[in-house]
Design a protein with these regions (language model features):
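Periplasmic/cell-envelope proteins involved in peptidoglycan metabolism and beta-lactam response
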Residues: 1-325, 336, 345, 370, ...
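Beta-lactam-recognizing serine transpeptidase/beta-lactamase-like catalytic domain environment
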Residues: 3-4, 200, 259, 301, ...
Length: 608
């Protein structure tokens, strides 16, 4: 249409500058297109309106009404177009950084100014000449990302270096002693495997070399040290495995090693000197005899293992020939290759009353006032508990209950204990935990906890039920009592020597830590002395030395004789050795284990 509805055509902008001008032209074109569409729609509407209202209206009135309608329509359409455009720009801005968003905003302001003053080029030149300032926060964010990546790579590098360092340094011996490490053969090609000896010079293992260079590992003491020394066929076991690195290392002087190298000869490996005492080892071996069981002797003040015996045993000199028989079905029950001293797990029987007594003392400061009347048999939490042979002990106090090893009294004590605290004590005493030793062992177990049924308490209190313990663990707790509550880490190797007897490395005892207070250890010592003086271990009384100990008879199968236990130390007031003995399936600890322990004590004190 002509007249008032015809818009004057605006001149196109001249010489746009760079990308900003192209962006401005795009926005201007978009706006002009919107306005053009609005004009056309307005005309169309007006023409339609004029045709409908042609009759009954004059031209002037029609013109005024149509103009108002067109303006309203234009305003509505322009508002919709503007809103749509604004939404598109917002969606686009979501993909831009803060700096880019500020740049886009400046461009839009630029074109707005351009349209207002009509001086496009000056505005563009002025605005585009200003540098876009970068937000320091953006740079800080980038720096943080760079630092994160740098820290990540630095951390990975340190982990890698630590991993390599661990295997090269700290764990190199474990790698070398691993029986699957084929590089051990490289050491064996240049070194004759060294000797293993007792602390008093008895040779336990050596390598004999024939004239043709053939080597043979020989064990002069045979069965007596079989489990502790081990073997080198069918893999390695015992000290032969644990000390493989030292046995295949030669610390002979440089010129001697050079001499052997030039002659294409092997150097003699170092000697491993153990803490074992030959006299005590023989006494322990003879004390167990032909029965199944174990004995272990420890020096409480240092942690030295002075003797370690397990029976049934095997002959390491003929093990290659005997291997099939030892592992046959007929021999499975004997488990000859199992070191019962460290890997055997048994119900501790009444030796566990040491721990029950300790927990009772901790929970009851008036424990000395305890009294109980034993009738030989009683029921606790629906569980019937009997004393050995249903013997009636009558009226007893706390110390007498312990000395007599009264089952009903200790079941009664157990029912008064806090199960959670009791379990915590056992954890402190290393039940369910790793023992601080460098040789293979089995972990003792104590399953009672705060949520356990009350029916489990009476049996647990007297060392029955589900509690299991190794002789090694038992002698460790006994040694801690003897050492004022402090446990020394058990160890088997005293020193490493070169083949001429020169010391290469000396090992000393290290404290693990206190398992109990000195006062608690002193009180338990007094109770254990009473066991020997007037209780179940009276067989050991009246000697030239005093003993503090505890017996145990652990039932493991209905109708079968119990396992016999004894654990103790001597001299009672200034302990030098701790002894633990278990003999399987024989009967009472006082009848079998105590006499066996006495042979070991006698051997020690007679040799002083």
């Amino acid at each position: 249409m002509e007249g008032p509805f015809k818009r004057k055509k605006k001149e196109e902008p001249r010489n746009m500058i760079g990308k900003n001008r192209r962006r401005g032209r795009l926005e201007d074109k978009t706006e002009n297109s919107a306005k053009k569409r609005t004009e056309e729609e307005a005309r169309s509407y007006a023409e339609s309106h004029f045709l409908q209202e042609e009759q009954g209206r004059d031209n002037e009135k029609n013109d005024q009404l149509t103009k108002e309608d067109i303006l309203k329509i234009r305003q509505i359409l322009e508002a919709e177009e503007k809103e749509k455009k604004q939404q598109e720009l917002q969606e686009q801005d979501e993909f831009l950084s803060d700096t880019e968003q500020r740049s886009e905003k400046r461009k839009r302001i630029l074109w707005k100014k351009q349209k207002e003053n009509g001086n496009e080029e000056e505005v563009i030149e002025e605005e585009t000449s200003k540098p876009v300032e970068k937000d320091p926060r953006d740079q800080a964010g980038i720096n943080r990302q760079i630092l994160k990546v740098a820290y990540l790579f630095a951390g990975l590098f340190l982990v890698l270096m630590g991993y390599i360092g661990y295997f090269v340094g700290a764990d190199s011996k474990n790698i070398i002693t691993n029986s699957r490490n084929e590089r051990q053969e490289l050491f064996a090609k240049s070194v004759i495997r060294g000797n293993i000896e007792t602390s008093d010079g008895e040779v336990l293992a050596k390598t004999e070399v024939a004239e043709d260079g053939t080597e043979k590992r020989v064990y002069p003491q045979g069965r007596q040290y079989a489990h502790v020394v081990g073997y080198t066929i069918k893999g390695k076991y015992g000290l032969e495995s644990a000390q493989n690195y030292n046995l295949l290392t030669s610390n002979a002087n440089f010129f001697e090693r050079l001499y052997h190298t030039l002659r294409n000869e092997k150097s003699q490996g170092d000697t491993v000197v153990t803490t074992l005492n030959s006299r005590l080892q023989k006494a322990a071996y003879d004390a167990i005899g032909d029965r199944k069981g174990a004995a272990i002797v420890m020096e409480p003040s240092t942690g030295k293992i002075l003797a370690m015996v397990s029976r049934p045993d095997f002959d390491p000199n003929t093990l290659s020939d005997d291997w099939a028989y030892i592992n046959s079905e007929a021999e499975q029950e004997n488990s000859r290759l199992l070191n019962r001293a460290t890997q055997g797990l048994y119900p501790p029987g009444s030796t566990y009353k040491i721990i029950t007594a300790l927990e009772y003392m901790r929970e009851n400061t008036n424990y000395k006032d305890y009294h109980y009347n034993c009738e030989g048999e009683s029921v606790f939490h629906s569980v019937s508990i009997e004393c050995y042979n249903k013997h009636r002990h009558g009226e007893e106090d706390f110390y007498e209950s312990f000395a007599n090893s009264c089952n009903t009294s200790f079941a009664n004590i157990g029912t008064s204990l806090n199960k959670k605290k009791w379990a915590d004590l056992c954890e402190e005493l290393l039940f369910n935990k790793a023992l601080p030793v460098s040789f293979p062992y089995s972990k003792s177990s104590f399953v009672l906890n705060g949520k356990s049924d009350d029916e489990e308490v009476p049996q647990t209190a007297i060392g029955q039920g589900k509690t299991l313990m190794s002789p090694l663990h038992n002698v460790m707790i006994t040694s801690a009592i003897a050492n004022g509550g402090v446990l020394m880490k058990p160890y088997l190797v005293d020193q490493i020597e070169n083949y001429t007897g020169g010391s290469v490395r000396k090992f000393t005892g290290k404290a693990y830590g206190a398992l109990m207070t000195a006062g608690e250890a002193e009180e338990l010592t007094a109770m254990m002395k009473q066991v020997v003086e007037e209780g179940t271990a009276s067989y050991l009384s009246g000697r030239s030395y005093t003993v503090a100990g505890k017996t145990g008879s652990a039932e493991f199968k209905e109708g079968e004789p119990a396992h016999a236990w004894f654990t103790g130390f001597a001299p009672a007031d200034n302990p030098e050795i701790a002894v633990c003995v278990i003999i399987e399936n024989v009967g009472a600890g006082s009848t079998y284990a105590v006499p066996a322990a006495s042979k070991i004590f006698d051997a020690y004190f007679s040799g002083k």
